[in-house]
Structures are given as structure tokens and as C-alpha cells.
């Protein structure tokens, strides 16, 4: 049936309005870009003494918190289990909690507990454990609606801290956990299952859990799935342990694939989509932008630019307009501004520790480093222009959620809702 142009425009505007809601319902916010506009809160002055609206004790884990409507959602570790919690956003009072899967013991600096950020879509919340247990719950009361196991259902072998083969120099791409977040588009949810035999990326009906298609034969790494339209084709883009691929959301056909070799298969950053381009970063290859062209069923990927010096260990770049804000390289990272059109460095400033989550709100860059220090600067390519700096929390690798002037911040022992203006 042909839709009248006026109706199509109204539908598009309605979808745009819904998607621009101020909530932070998933990893990196409403559009998975870590960029939002909130004219009501220009942050012209940053309060050096933030106001805590509430604060609660939490268990271990580096999973980031999210905000959906009047609910705050987070995951932590309790008594050997990874647990999802839903709270009243206004008061911090718990509404319900549920066990997602057994905790995994890790031998690294990031500690134990969940590492994947939950996802809210309408009246449902989706959670994933490090060990690959994936659950869909009712956001209202915590009733489990459907579930899958990466290993039991799809044969995605869990290596933990071990190498996949005795004596092998290769390391398991998921040895630090199944950390990449799923993504939703329409009635489909795209889950990074990571089974070489049964699908790297698998699409399910988001309401029933019915499998729709499976694509790829790579192990997953730690990168989250992102959905967008590239060269006119709606696709799920996924950075695996070995490559990056674009998958047709409707059919599961792989539209393009590019080998991305990094040490220990450590592909962590979420791909950044901009028009027909995809930007990725890693500790081995630096930062690279690719351009996608052509039509389905087979598209072409070509390198637009690369900055080999801009190596990022576990951070994801954030693009705002024609600027990219990122971190790297090394364990004492700089905050860096790149030009999106050519990848050249515009400016850099030290002091980010070994990680920083970067959020852009209006014309301000908010960089929360691993030591819990928040650095605020103008989103300006001419020079680093700091507008605020304060200690926000203890050591953390979790990204904050933002909603209507409020920040939801999680470290290793506290979850805090606070304001800065």
C-alpha cells in the first residue's frame, strides 16, 4: 500500500520526536551516540559542589546505568550472581531486582561483576551477563518474558580467562566477558551472541525471543551493536573479534565486511556512524573512518582516512558535528579532539587516566575519567577550553546516564543521581 506523502512526513516527525526523548535508555544514550541536546540546561556554569539527589550502595561491576522514564536501571554483583535492579528515579527506592546469570571470576584490574549495559525499549528491559545469559523482563514488575543462553542455545563457547587452545598465542576474544550491548530496531533486537557455528550476530523478535536470522562466523569481542542507514540501506553494524560487518536488518545478509586485526582480538569501541561513514578505534590500529557505498545485497567499504597515532584501549569516540572527541593512547590518556572530515588532531590535553567516557551535551564535552574526575570543556575545535573540573565519584569504568539536567553515576560501590548546574 502506498503511503501519502503527508502521512509519511507526519510518521517520520513522530518517530523523530520519540527518539529525541531526554531519557538515556541504553548504552551511550537515546541514539547510541553519547550526544544529546537539552536547551533547558546549557551548563554555562558547572557547580564545583554537585548536589546529590540520592545515593545508594551497590555491588561490583562496570555495567553502565541507564534512565527510562521514571525508572533508573543498573546491574551489579550480589552473592555470586549478576543482578539487574530497577529503581524509582525520583527517590532511588528499588522496585524490583532479578538474577541474570552467575558472576564470572576475572583476573584483571576491572574486577568482577556485570559489564554489559542493560537496554530499555518501551515496557521491557533487556539484560546480559558476562557469561552470555540474555534475559528480557517486564520493566514494570520484573517478570521474565524470554531468555537465551549464548553457550547452551548457540554453542558460543565461554573461555573465561583462558586461551581457546592450549599453547596458543591467540587469546579468546571474550575472555573479559560478553560485554557488547544488543541494539533494537523496529520489532527486532540484534544480540552479539558470538557463535562461529551458529551466528556472530543474531536477530530475535524483541517481544517473543523468536530467532529471525543469524549472520557471521566470528567470535565477538567487546563492542556494542549500532544500527543506522548507510548508503540507503538499514543495517546493524558490529565490530567482532576479527572484523567489522554491516548486516541487513531485514534479511540478515552481510552487506560488507572489513578485516580488523587487533592484539588479543581486543575490539572494544562502539562503531560511530555519520552519514555513510563508520569510524572505529582500537589500541592496535588507531582510529579509522570508512565509507560505505553501493546497494544491497552487496555494498562496498573503503577507507576514508586513518590516524594511526590515535590508539584507544577501551574508549569509544564521540562525534558532535564535524568534531570527534576521543582518548588515547596509553595508560595516562589525553583527551583529544579530531576533525571528523580528515582525522587530524585539533587539540589534546592530558589527565584522563586509563579511560574516559565522553558525552556531549549541547556545546559542552563531559569527560568522566577512570579516576572519577569529570572534566567539562567547550565542544570547540580551535583549542581546549575547560569550563569545569570536579571529583564526581570513586574509580569507575562505567559511563554516566543523563536526563533533564541529572546525571546517574556509578562507581564500584555507589550509584548516585546528581545535578551540576
What spans do the regions from the language model cover?
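Bacterial N-terminal signal peptides
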Residues: 6-16
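N-terminal secretory signal peptides that target proteins for export/translocation
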Residues: 1-3
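Noncatalytic, solvent-exposed loop/strand surfaces
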Residues: 20-421
Amino acid at each position: 500500500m502506498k503511503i501519502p506523502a503527508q502521512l509519511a512526513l507526519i510518521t517520520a516527525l513522530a518517530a523523530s520526536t520519540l527518539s529525541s526523548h531526554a531519557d538515556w535508555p541504553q548504552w551511550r544514550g537515546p541514539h547510541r551516540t553519547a550526544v544529546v541536546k537539552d536547551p533547558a540546561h546549557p551548563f554555562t556554569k558547572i557547580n564545583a559542589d554537585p548536589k546529590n539527589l540520592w545515593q545508594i550502595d551497590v555491588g561490583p561491576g562496570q555495567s553502565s546505568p541507564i534512565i527510562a522514564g521514571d525508572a533508573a536501571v543498573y546491574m551489579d554483583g550480589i552473592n555470586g550472581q549478576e543482578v539487574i535492579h530497577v529503581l524509582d528515579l525520583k527517590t532511588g527506592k528499588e522496585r524490583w531486582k532479578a538474577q541474570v546469570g552467575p558472576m564470572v571470576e576475572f583476573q584483571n584490574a576491572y574486577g568482577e561483576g556485570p559489564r554489559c549495559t542493560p537496554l530499555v525499549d518501551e515496557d521491557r528491559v533487556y539484560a546480559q551477563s558476562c557469561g552470555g545469559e540474555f534475559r528480557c523482563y517486564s520493566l514494570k514488575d520484573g517478570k521474565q518474558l524470554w531468555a537465551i543462553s549464548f553457550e547452551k542455545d548457540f554453542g558460543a563457547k565461554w573461555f573465561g580467562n583462558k586461551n581457546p587452545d592450549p599453547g596458543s598465542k591467540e587469546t579468546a576474544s571474550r575472555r573479559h566477558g560478553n560485554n557488547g550491548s544488543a541494539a533494537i530496531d523496529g520489532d527486532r533486537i540484534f544480540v552479539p551472541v558470538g557463535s562461529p557455528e551458529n551466528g556472530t550476530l543474531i536477530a530475535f523478535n524483541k517481544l517473543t525471543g523468536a530467532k529471525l536470522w543469524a549472520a557471521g562466523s566470528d567470535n565477538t569481542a567487546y563492542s556494542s551493536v549500532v544500527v543506522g542507514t548507510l548508503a540507503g540501506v538499514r543495517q546493524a553494524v558490529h565490530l567482532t573479534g576479527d572484523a567489522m560487518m554491516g548486516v541487513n536488518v531485514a534479511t540478515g545478509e552481510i552487506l560488507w565486511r572489513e578485516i580488523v586485526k587487533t592484539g588479543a582480538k581486543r575490539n572494544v569501541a562502539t562503531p560511530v556512524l555519520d552519514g555513510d561513514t563508520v569510524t572505529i578505534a582500537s589500541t592496535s590500529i588507531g582510529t579509522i573512518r570508512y565509507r560505505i557505498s553501493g546497494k544491497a545485497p552487496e555494498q562496498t567499504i573503503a577507507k576514508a582516512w586513518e590516524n594511526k597515532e590515535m590508539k584507544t584501549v577501551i574508549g569509544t569516540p564521540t562525534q558532535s558535528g564535524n568534531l570527534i572527541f576521543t582518548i588515547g593512547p596509553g595508560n595516562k590518556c589525553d583527551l583529544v579532539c579530531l576533525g571528523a572530515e580528515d582525522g587530524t588532531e585539533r587539540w589534546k590535553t592530558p589527565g584522563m587516566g586509563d579511560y574516559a567516557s565522553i558525552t556531549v551535551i549541547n556545546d559542552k564535552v563531559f569527560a568522566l575519567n577512570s579516576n572519577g574526575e569529570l572534566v567539562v570543556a567547550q565542544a570547540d575545535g580551535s583549542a581546549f577550553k575547560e569550563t569545569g573540573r570536579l571529583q564526581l565519584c570513586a574509580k569507575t569504568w562505567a559511563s554516566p546516564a543523563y536526563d533533564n539536567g541529572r546525571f546517574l553515576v556509578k562507581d564500584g560501590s555507589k550509584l548516585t543521581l546528581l545535578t551540576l548546574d
